[in-house]
């Protein structure tokens, strides 16, 4: 039946017309999808949770705010022993103080800068000493720590590219490598927080996209290598949650923009002009003020990856517009996605 269906000409397959709208300029394009390869109504469920969380140790990086802060509290409520890695614990950050105020022996904040090898190794020792039986290992690692920026390629300094990569990519690699011995002993889980921009590129986001594409590749390689050892590796690819994570305030956007413009080579400023530059900054401000403020879909995805007997390889917590755009940009010829989304 399937072979017969696949052998039929595409024109004979029952299709569904779908109108795609580009939010940036309102342009609509009609695409024809075929159920044999695509079903827009199919939704994943997280009903296969089987592994008990009680007492299992999990380290989450980047818990000062955003996803990490919410994850630390949520996983603690589920019964995990949570080690919350915080960049600003030594500075008494408000997020750290709130986590510490729970006064639970199952939620412990630790100083952790994922760019600092010494701090990462100290975190390993802290976790190991906090385990009931270190020989049984640690159940989960959630690589959540990350930073973001914006700016077209000619507007972005090499220092910015390196800074974003050091946190998002090398921080993930560094932390994972250090904790793998404990994770292997438990046959546990690695959950890497990537982004929809780790699957599809976007203008003015190249420093971020590069690092998240790298996280995707690293996660795939690690998944292949860990499979025979019983460690499961998942990637969570959130959509636009900037409004929920407070990555960009209007003041921060303007500060970044001013620094960027001031540091541009004279030839770049002259060729592009201030009007073009300001238009791009205004577009970034609009994007940063949009998106979901409810992070529960991301929290639920990470929880499933840590607790399901058979976790998914990839999770896509995002609204329908971004999910559809990702399908178009990753499954269709580049000429089609370029026509829809490049202006």
From Swiss-Prot:
Sequence positions that bind NAD(+)? 59-83
Question: Does the keyword Metal-binding belong to this entry?
Answer: no
- Record field: catalytic activity: (R)-3-hydroxybutanoate + NAD(+) = acetoacetate + NADH + H(+)
Q: Tell me what controls its activity.
A: Requires phosphatidylcholine as an allosteric activator for enzymatic activity.
GO biological processes:
adipose tissue development; liver development; response to cadmium ion; response to corticosterone; response to estradiol; response to ethanol; response to growth hormone; response to hormone
* Entry-linked Pfam families: adh_short (PF00106)
**Which residue positions are annotated as catalytic?**
208 (proton acceptor)
Q: Where is the transit peptide?
A: 1-46
Q: Does Acetylation count among this protein's keywords?
A: yes
User: Which positions bear N6-succinyllysine?
Assistant: 103, 259
UniProt KW keywords = Acetylation, Allosteric enzyme, Glycoprotein, Lipid metabolism, Membrane, Mitochondrion, Mitochondrion inner membrane, NAD, Oxidoreductase, Phosphoprotein, Transit peptide
Q: What is its EC number?
A: 1.1.1.30
- Glycosylated residues in this chain: 219
Q: Which GO terms describe its cellular component?
A: intracellular membrane-bounded organelle; matrix side of mitochondrial inner membrane; mitochondrial inner membrane; mitochondrial matrix
Subcellular compartments: Mitochondrion inner membrane; Mitochondrion matrix
Q: In which tissues is it expressed?
A: Expressed in liver.
Tell me the GO molecular function terms: 3-hydroxybutyrate dehydrogenase activity; phospholipid binding
Which InterPro entries would you find in this protein's record? NAD(P)-bd_dom_sf, Sc_DH/Rdtase_CS, SDR_fam
User: Subunit composition?
Assistant: Homotetramer.
Q: What is this protein called?
A: D-beta-hydroxybutyrate dehydrogenase, mitochondrial
Q: What is the lineage of its organism?
A: Eukaryota, Metazoa, Chordata, Craniata, Vertebrata
């Amino acid at each position: 039946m399937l072979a017969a269906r696949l052998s039929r000409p595409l024109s004979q397959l029952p299709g569904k017309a779908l109108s795609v709208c580009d939010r940036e300029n309102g342009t609509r394009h009609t695409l024809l999808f075929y159920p044999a390869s695509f079903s827009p109504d199919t939704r994943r469920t997280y009903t296969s949770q089987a592994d008990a969380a009680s007492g299992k140790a999990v380290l989450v990086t980047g818990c000062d705010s955003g996803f990490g802060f919410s994850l630390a509290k949520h996983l603690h409520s589920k019964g995990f022993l949570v080690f919350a890695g915080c960049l600003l614990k030594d500075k008494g950050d408000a997020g750290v103080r709130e986590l510490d105020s729970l006064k639970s022996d199952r939620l412990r904040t630790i100083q952790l800068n994922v760019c600092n090898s010494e701090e990462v190794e100290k975190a390993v020792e802290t976790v190991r000493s906090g385990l009931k039986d270190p020989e049984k290992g640690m159940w989960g690692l959630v690589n959540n720590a990350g930073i973001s920026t914006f700016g077209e390629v000619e507007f972005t300094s090499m220092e910015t590219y390196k800074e974003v990569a050091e946190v998002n990519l090398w921080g993930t690699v560094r932390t994972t490598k250090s904790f793998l011995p404990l994770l292997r002993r438990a046959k546990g889980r690695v959950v890497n927080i990537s982004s929809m921009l780790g699957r599809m590129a976007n203008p003015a986001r190249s420093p971020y996209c590069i690092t998240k594409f790298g996280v995707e590749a690293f996660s795939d390689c690690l998944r292949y290598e860990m499979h025979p050892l019983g460690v499961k590796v998942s990637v969570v690819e959130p959509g636009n949650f900037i409004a929920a994570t407070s990555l960009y305030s209007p003041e921060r956007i303007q500060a970044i923009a001013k620094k960027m413009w001031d540091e541009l080579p004279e030839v770049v400023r002259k060729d592009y002009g201030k009007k073009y530059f300001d238009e791009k900054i205004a577009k970034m401000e609009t994007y940063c003020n949009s998106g979901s403020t409810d992070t529960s879909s991301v929290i639920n995805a990470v929880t499933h990856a840590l607790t399901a007997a058979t976790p998914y390889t990839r999770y896509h917590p995002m609204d329908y517009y971004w999910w559809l755009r990702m399908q178009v940009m990753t499954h269709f010829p580049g000429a089609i996605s370029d026509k829809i989304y490049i202006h």
